[in-house]
């Protein structure tokens, strides 16, 4: 390597662990940041992207992440030991440092930064839990509803303009994933 060349791109694989013989299943087009941790029965769909320092721990039930869904930096996703697994649909955005536990996030759901979604909760298609919101056990956010607070409560149904704004997040992260896949490399001063 000459002084002017950069190291080759990092092959993104994250830290992957089997648990009791069950390994993560990662679609070839999904992307996992090198510092993300996936344990056990984690299933990533096409184009799903898991960012830096996320932990997805599927030790007692599966975690399913749908196509093009983005799990942003520092998020923790887990399951419970009963009936509740974590089911994340297609085109879902989960903001930085969220906690998602044994719940269902339907297609195009949006979970804000630092928000928490607890066991048995459901966020229907296009539903939004704002940053630092707390969706309590068993609660349901309806289609295109905006919820906030701790505990979270419904504020209103989002307008078409608001929905369009949130819908920009998924293509942004798909594009960013492609840039990281091609351009992330190690560096030492």
What residue spans do the PLM features occupy?
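Glycine-rich hexapeptide-repeat left-handed beta-helix
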Residues: 1-25, 59, 65-67, 73-88, ...
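N-terminal segments that cap or nucleate solenoid repeat domains
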Residues: 11-50
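Generic short beta-strand segments
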Residues: 35, 53, 73-74
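Short proline/glycine- and basic residue-enriched helix-capping loop/turn segments at helix->loop/beta transitions
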Residues: 93
């Amino acid at each position: 390597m000459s002084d002017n060349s950069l190291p080759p791109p990092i092959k993104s694989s994250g830290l992957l662990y089997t648990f009791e013989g069950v390994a993560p299943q990662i679609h070839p087009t999904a992307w996992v940041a090198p510092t993300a941790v996936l344990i056990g029965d984690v299933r990533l769909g096409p184009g799903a992207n898991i960012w830096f320092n996320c932990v997805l721990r599927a030790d007692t039930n599966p975690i399913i992440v749908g196509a093009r869904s983005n799990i942003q930096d520092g998020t923790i996703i887990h399951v419970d030991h009963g009936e509740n697994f974590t089911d994340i649909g297609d085109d879902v955005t989960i903001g930085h440092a969220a906690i998602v536990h044994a719940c269902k996030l339907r297609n195009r759901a949006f979970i804000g930064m630092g928000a928490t979604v607890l066991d048995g909760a459901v966020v229907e298609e296009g539903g939004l839990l704002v940053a630092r919101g707390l969706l309590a056990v068993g609660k349901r956010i309806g289609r295109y509803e905006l919820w906030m607070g701790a505990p979270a409560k419904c504020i209103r149904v989002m307008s078409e303009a608001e929905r369009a704004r949130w819908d920009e997040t998924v293509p942004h992260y798909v594009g960013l994933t492609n840039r990281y896949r091609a351009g992330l490399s190690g560096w030492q001063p």
